[in-house]
């Protein structure tokens, strides 16, 4: 008979970790996601495309190549790395290594200056590529911890909390950058300092470049609860080199057997396109808007703050829909509706909406941001898009 005081089982069938253990796990995503939100979506990538490269179209092309290269590298290496980690048993060493790489790379973003001075354009792309690959590998090993530490009936809550912490961290850091570095000296509000803090020079785009070091500090700080309080898998005792050989051998064997398991093969291909599609959509959100509407850092920060808040609302509603409809149906609704809204987003230009309908470019209100009708429509549509996409982001497995 099972003891009334026995630990609840995890999805892996082993005793789950204590609440401190699995709740501390959520800080890993809270540490990691603000980098993605600030650097990739809203601030640094648009700065890189428009100001470092100096040509939004060419900049977007380079970012597209960057994402494609990172995707290829991950497609070729992630299965082997996962198998190696399974053979060795431990995930934390991988998380430590990738977080250190990301933090060093994020700090280096400070030296990527306008016009390709400082670190040049192509060395900068290489740094961003290394960070992107390390980010994804960190995500793989961090997520791999979840099934073995979380009670089965807490999986939805824990994954949703991790997603929310990531967005909360992004909102807090963007708000700090907005009030401390971007708005001072540009608008006469009594609660703002007269000049950007710490001598940040807006003319040199230091308020764009500072987001890398800020994200690095945040990442290092909030990864600590995972390392200190979340239990790692037990070491198998297999030497690293033997684990690598066995892991590679298992992956090759599994790939050879996929022809007998067509459903699994279809799932893996679908998952690859699903994840790559989400990454592409999120990456180009701020880059596309900044290039199309000539939005600066302050405007993008406001967009990011509101959109991240909308994403949290969508994630909360998505969790409720999970309970009512099931996760598969919720995921289907999320993907279908976000795809429809995405078509609306890309149909908006400064002087047209829905591809064909002409609109005036004149301001429709006195607020200094999002002044034209098309800008307001893009802003509003972005909120709807974030609400529909976020339930899919809560479920990395389709």
Q: PLM features: residue spans?
A:
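Cytoplasmic membrane-interface "Motif A"-like loop-to-helix N-cap segments
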Residues: 85-101, 323-338
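Juxtamembrane intracellular "pre-TM" segments in multi-pass secondary transporters
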Residues: 5-23, 231-269
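Short amphipathic helix-loop junctions that connect adjacent transmembrane helices
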Residues: 37-61, 280-303
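Glycine-rich segments within core transmembrane alpha-helices of 12-TM secondary carriers
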Residues: 159-185
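Intracellular juxtamembrane helix-capping segments at the cytosolic ends
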Residues: 137-151, 380-397
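Central cavity-lining transmembrane alpha-helices of secondary-active solute carriers
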Residues: 63-83, 104, 171-174, 305-317
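Helix-to-loop junctions at the C-terminal end of transmembrane segments
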Residues: 76-90, 313-327, 353
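C-terminal ends and interior cores of transmembrane alpha-helices
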Residues: 97-118, 336-362
């Amino acid at each position: 008979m099972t003891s009334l005081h026995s630990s609840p089982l995890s999805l892996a069938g082993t005793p789950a970790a204590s609440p401190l253990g699995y709740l501390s796990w959520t800080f890993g995503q809270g540490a990691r996601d603000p980098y993605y939100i600030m650097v990739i979506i809203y601030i640094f990538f648009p700065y890189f495309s428009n100001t470092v490269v100096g040509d939004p179209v060419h900049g977007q092309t380079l970012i597209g190549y960057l994402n494609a290269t990172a995707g290829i590298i991950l497609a070729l290496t992630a299965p082997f790395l996962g198998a190696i980690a399974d053979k060795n048993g431990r995930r934390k060493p991988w998380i430590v290594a990738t977080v250190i790489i990301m933090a060093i790379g994020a700090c280096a973003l400070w030296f990527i200056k306008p016009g390709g001075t400082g670190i040049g354009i192509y060395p900068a792309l290489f740094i961003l590529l290394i960070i992107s690959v390390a980010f994804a590998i960190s995500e793989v090993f961090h997520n791999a911890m979840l099934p073995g530490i979380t009670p089965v009936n807490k999986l939805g809550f824990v994954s949703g909390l991790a997603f929310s912490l990531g967005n909360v961290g992004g909102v807090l850091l963007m708000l700090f950058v907005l009030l401390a570095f971007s708005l001072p000296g540009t608008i006469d509000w009594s609660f703002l300092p007269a000049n950007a803090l710490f001598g940040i020079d807006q003319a040199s785009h230091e308020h764009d470049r500072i987001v890398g070091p800020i994200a690095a500090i945040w990442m290092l700080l909030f990864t600590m609860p995972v390392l200190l309080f979340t239990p790692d898998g037990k070491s198998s005792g297999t030497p690293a080199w033997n684990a690598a050989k066995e892991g590679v051998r298992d992956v090759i064997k599994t790939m050879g057997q996929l022809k007998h398991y067509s459903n699994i093969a279809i799932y893996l291909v679908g998952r690859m396109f699903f994840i790559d599609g989400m990454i592409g959509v999120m990456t180009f959100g701020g880059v596309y808007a900044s290039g199309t509407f000539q939005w600066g850092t302050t405007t993008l920060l406001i967009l990011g703050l509101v959109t991240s808040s909308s994403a949290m609302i969508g994630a909360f509603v998505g969790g409720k829909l999970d309970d009512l409809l099931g996760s598969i149906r919720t995921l289907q609704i999320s993907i279908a509706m976000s795809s429809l809204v995405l078509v609306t987003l890309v149909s908006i230009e400064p002087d047209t909406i829905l591809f064909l309908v002409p609109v005036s470019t004149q301001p429709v209100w006195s607020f200094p941001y999002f002044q034209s009708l098309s800008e307001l429509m893009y802003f509003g549509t972005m909120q709807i898009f974030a609400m529909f996409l976020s339930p899919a982001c809560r479920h990395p497995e389709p």
